[in-house]
């Protein structure tokens, strides 16, 4: 069945039937203000409700875990972006940097901006977009400080736009 799970900042989760183009609600409710959603390699559904941390659900919507600043080491409850890399969930937050969650242990690691440190420091702590490419590099789009390439041994920030010429 060709169905796409989508999220909307104001309409919550939606299932889009790619054959008919019709949307319907999933059989479970996660609220209306959903910032991001990810289905990982284990078919778990990760849902980021606005200012609600991160929820992990089974494919049929049963709640497996909830991570917030109150019950875990998540650095910020406003989760803007999600990606998976080698079984870990990368979590871009609005002001809390990038949290890396091992779903098996519940342990968080943190990548953040450290003032005065260029090595292994993010240029900013608000991460709008995360993407894991085919070479297993994470690309992070910050809100005001450029595009960040995160590799196993290095990090590079791109802030300058290439010059454009009029045709």
Spell out what each predicted region is:
Residues 1-167:
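Carboxylate-rich, polar loop motifs that coordinate divalent cations or form catalytic acidic clusters
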């Amino acid at each position: 069945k060709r169905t796409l799970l989508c999220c909307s900042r104001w309409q919550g989760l939606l299932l889009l039937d790619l054959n008919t183009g019709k949307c319907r609600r999933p059989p479970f409710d996660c609220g209306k203000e959903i910032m991001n959603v990810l289905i990982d390699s284990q078919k778990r559904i990760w849902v980021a409700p606005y200012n609600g941390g991160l929820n992990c659900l089974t494919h049929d919507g049963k709640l497996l875990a909830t991570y917030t600043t109150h019950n875990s080491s998540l650095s910020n409850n406003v989760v803007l972006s999600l990606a998976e890399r080698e079984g870990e969930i990368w979590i871009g937050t609005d002001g809390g940097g990038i949290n890396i969650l091992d779903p098996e242990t519940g342990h968080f690691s943190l990548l953040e901006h450290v003032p005065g440190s260029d090595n292994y420091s993010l240029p900013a702590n608000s991460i709008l977009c995360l993407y894991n490419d085919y070479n297993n590099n994470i690309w992070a789009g910050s809100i005001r400080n450029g595009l960040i390439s995160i590799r196993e041994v290095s990090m590079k920030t791109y802030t300058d736009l290439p010059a454009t010429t009029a045709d």
